[in-house]
């Protein structure tokens, strides 16, 4: 089949780029021709103002060189024209948080396709989309009904997490079990795509460093500056005493400003970003796809989970040291949903990592076996491959 992928592929964001790449490569590995529909949102352009200029160009270069793209689209009309020209046999939506916003004219619910007399017969399915919001009840009855009507026309639906499944079923289908399949993120399969890639180590030794991703200018102002600096000094001391370097893998928005032994400079290619995580002794820090990449690679990890409940109540619980109670409030977090029920459920804190024990986190990372991380990965991939086989069968009928 010739399959079009409609997802968030353009953002200057490592995870967005890699999930599109992994979906494309997986479909190709199953014998299909896969192209990423180059739909550009206003938000994609906005990233240019938010990230380092060199890093923005690195993401743009990756998308335009590594992804098999269609012509560019910015409207529903463009999408219809491109799909007709490409003569796709099927469209897949996702992965990533493409089902979170009512402000995109239901592009990612394929309303534009279902309304087209010429295209409405093309089968549509989803690959691990997520909602990552407060639900759909804030939308008007008409908006919710329009989304429901679209979903009823999908041939096969998977979502990335339990929160998205429960939210759709509750808010759009009156608690009916309409969505039943939770599908792991495509980036779990990324390790399969790097066998021919060469890591630009910049003088670092494989498994000779701990890797961290912290917020931009983490301790350069705001609250708890002294506590952040002390936490970092303590964690770095544990890492160095054990014989490792502490290396920063900066987020696209900017470097942390902390005194790492080494900071990977921009520009960072998304595949090189993955290889830095793969070759680390352990990873500690921000971002969902950094954690999925660590799992894909068998790298021990600890998540600085900024996606959870950041209410004042949760922050107070963390400041008081009541971390376990605070983490039970994170049901919307994609890290919470990723790790829930696994042996790694406790391998996360919220954004206030400075109130956690640096010694405890270091010990958790040192005691984690790569074999156990790989077992967790392989369980997720087994689910992913089962769902993908069912999805491909559904859209081929």
Describe the residue ranges of each PLM region.
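Active-site anion-handling motifs in enzyme catalytic cores
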Residues: 1-397
